[in-house]
Amino acid sequence: MKLSNLSEDYKNKTLNLFVVNILIVGILPIIFYFVLGYFSGFGFYIINSQLILNFQNISLYILALGVLIPISILFATLFTGLDRNKISNIFPLLTNFVIYGLLFYLAAVIIIFIFCFFLFLNELLGLKVIFIAIGAALSLAFFYIFPPLVKGVFNFTKINYVPIVGVSLNKKDHSKIFSVVSDLSKKINAKMPKNIVLGLSTDFFAISKDLKVFNGINQTTLKNETLYISIPYLRILTIKELEGIIGHELGHFEGKDTIYAMKFAPIFRRLNEHFLALDEEFEDKKKEFKSDPMLIKLAVYPFIFLFNEFSRKEERISKEQELKADKFGADASESSDVFITALSKLYIYDLVWEDTKNKFKEIVREKIKNKIKNLSLEFVRTARLLLEKDKLKVYLKNLQFYEQLHPSDTHPPLEDRMKNLGVKMEKISNKSLVNFLPSSASLIPNIDLIEENLTIVLNEIEKFQNES
C-alpha cells in the first residue's frame, strides 16, 4: 500500500509528533483562559462574572480534551502492541474519538473566541460603530483561518466508496471456478467466499466487507466475503498455480485475519486514502498560492500521529499474515515450488502490465484509431514481445528484493517468501516461467467476452477522466 507524503515525512518520529500535537491543541485554550481572566464584565452591557468564569472552565475542559487526543493515541499504541484482537477493537473507537473529538474541540474554540471578542468590544470599546466594524473585520479574518482547520478534520469523516470495475460471477454459469474455490476452502479449512469477482487488473485479494462492483452497466454491492481474481493473470497462470494464489488469499479468511480485516484494515486504508487526497490538494495549493497550506496541515497532525503509530504495527502484522498465507498457498498448489513459481510470475509480469496499461491510456488519450479491444490478450502479446524467455530468471533475481504493492498492504520481498517456504532460486526455471498451460483461463467460460466488455468499460472511464 502506497503511503502518503504526509505520513512518510513523519515516519518513526513518535516523540516529535506527540510534542507537536500537545502544543497545537494546548495553545489556544490556554490563551483563552488567561485572556478571559482580564475581563470584569462591566461595559456597555453588564456581563455576569459567573458566565466569564464558566467560559474559563470550558477553556480548561477543551484543553483537557485536546491534550487527551494525542495522549490516548500514545497509550493505545502501547497497550495494543501487536495483538490483532486489541488493535481490531480499539483502533476504530480511537479513530472516531480523534475525528469527533477534534470537531468538538474546534467548535468550542470558535465559540470561546466569539465570546472573548464580544467582551473585548463591550469593555474596552463600548460597542461604538467604528469598533464594531473593526471587530467584524477581525472576526472575518478569524473565520478565514478556521474553515481550513475544520476542513482538514472534516475530510476524515467522509467515507469514499470507490467501486471496483469488474464482473461478479454466478455459480450456474461459472461452476468450474466456484468448484475450485470450494475445494480449496475445504482443503485449507478456510471460509468459502460468497462472491467471486473478475477484474482487468493484476490484483488478487480477499475481502470480508461490503464491496461495490461496477460492470459498466450496473453497480452492485456485494455482501460478506468476496474473492477478487485478476483476469490478465488467468492468462499466464496454470491451474495449479492459480490454486496456489487463491489458497493464499483464502488463507486471509482464516482465524484472526478475518476480524482484523473487517475491523482494522478498512479504516486504516480509508485514512491513508484521505492522506493521499490531501497530498494532491497540497500540491495544487502550492502551485496556486506558491506556499504550503499550513492551516490544514495543523488540523491533520493528530491524524498523522494516529496513522503513523498504527502503520508500524500494520507493516509487521501484514508481513506476518502474508508469510502465513503463503503456507496455505503452498498447500493449495500441492507444492511450494509451484506456488513460488506462481508468485514469481506475478512479480515479473506485473512490469509488463504497467507497460500495457500505459499504452492503453495513451491510445485513449491521443484518440488513436487502432484501439485495444482486449486488454488482457494485449497484455499477453506484450509479455511475449518484451520478455526474453531465456532471461526471465535474470529479471527474477533482480526482483527478489522488491516489495510488491497490493491494494490493502505491501507484500514481503520475494526472497523472504522463498525462505519462508524453503524454496531456493535454483528451483525456478525459465521454462516454468513461460509455461501457461494448462491455462487457468479455461476455468472461465466466454472469458474473451468478459475481457472485451471490461476493456470497453475501462476505455470509457479513461475517456471521461481525460475530459474532466
Which residues are covered by each model-predicted region?
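Short, charged/polar micro-motifs that form catalytic or ligand-binding hotspots
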Residues: A136, L140, V167-K171, P232, ...
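Hydrophobic or amphipathic, alpha-helical segments that drive membrane association/targeting
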Residues: M1-A206, D350, K427-N435, I444-S468
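Post-HEXXH active-site segment of zinc metalloproteases
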Residues: G255-F289, F339-Y347, I428
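Short, flexible helix-coil linker/hinge segments at the edges of structured domains or between repeats
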Residues: K209-L222, I267-N308, E366-N370
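Hydrophobic topogenic segments
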Residues: A76-P92, R269-N272, L276-E283, F307-K324, ...
